[in-house]
């Protein structure tokens, strides 16, 4: 199935399963950044030791042009929405220091003006009792989003909390294995109280095109980085 037909099928399913947006025919669509729009593994692997704890996102936001790759199937999806007149927003858990560099990169790639706090939002996680929790749902509510595409559990939870339809972009294997824990706990460690799902369990979910929160799985085929 071609990318265009796949996108059309996903949209058709969406239209028949939840109410239409407030403005008929026009959708407000949100996208996460890391591992959804950008394969940013190399940025996070190369953070200098003195900028790791906590992560210096002012440094991170300046490195994408040199180290990150656009995930082409997601780019095609975003361009489809743009070309058909829908509203696109980017929402990331990064902090906003030097966010203009990320905005510039997105503007260049999508050929539309991307501006911090207008269609690019930085929503750092909030620390509560020693654990970090997403704050993206607040921005999703303000934007009255219809759909949100993301790779992480926190993206799905934020969308559901905001009353937005969540759609999972499956994180690339190289991203999971080389620098970051998987969602659903750490599936690489197998099942435990903290990690209720193992890698094989995820494959069962994905084969049915559904995630553990009931979210849709957006099917993409991307070869990833050369190494």
Each predicted region: which residue ranges?
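Short, Lys/Arg-rich N-terminal segment immediately upstream of the first membrane anchor
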Residues: 1-3, 26
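Compositionally biased regions
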Residues: 3-4, 18
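Sec-dependent signal peptide recognition
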Residues: 4-12
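Boundary at the C-terminal end of the N-terminal hydrophobic targeting segment
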Residues: 19-24
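Alpha-helical substrate-recognition element adjacent to the catalytic core
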Residues: 25-127
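C-terminal cap/substrate-recognition subdomain and adjoining C-terminal extension
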Residues: 95-227
């Amino acid at each position: 199935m071609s990318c265009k037909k796949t996108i059309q099928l996903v949209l058709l399913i969406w239209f028949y399963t939840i109410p239409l947006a407030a403005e008929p025919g026009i959708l407000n669509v949100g996208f996460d950044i890391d591992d959804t729009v950008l394969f940013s593994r190399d940025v996070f692997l190369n953070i200098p030791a003195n900028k790791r704890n906590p992560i210096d996102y002012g440094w991170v936001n300046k490195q994408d042009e040199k180290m990150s790759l656009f995930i082409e199937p997601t780019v095609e999806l975003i361009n489809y929405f743009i070309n058909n007149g829908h509203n696109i927003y980017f929402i990331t858990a990064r902090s906003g220091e030097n966010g203009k560099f990320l905005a510039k990169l997105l503007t260049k790639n999508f050929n539309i003006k991307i501006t911090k706090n207008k269609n690019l939002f930085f929503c750092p996680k909030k620390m509560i009792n020693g654990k970090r929790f997403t704050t993206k749902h607040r921005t999703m509510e303000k934007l009255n989003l219809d759909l949100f595409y993301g790779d992480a559990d926190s993206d799905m939870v934020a969308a559901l909390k905001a009353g937005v339809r969540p759609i999972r972009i499956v994180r690339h294997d190289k991203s999971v294995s080389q620098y970051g824990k998987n969602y659903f706990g750490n599936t690489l460690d197998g099942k435990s109280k903290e990690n209720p799902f193992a890698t094989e369990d995820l494959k069962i979910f994905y084969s049915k095109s559904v995630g553990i929160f009931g979210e849709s799985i957006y099917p993409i085929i991307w070869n990833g980085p050369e190494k």
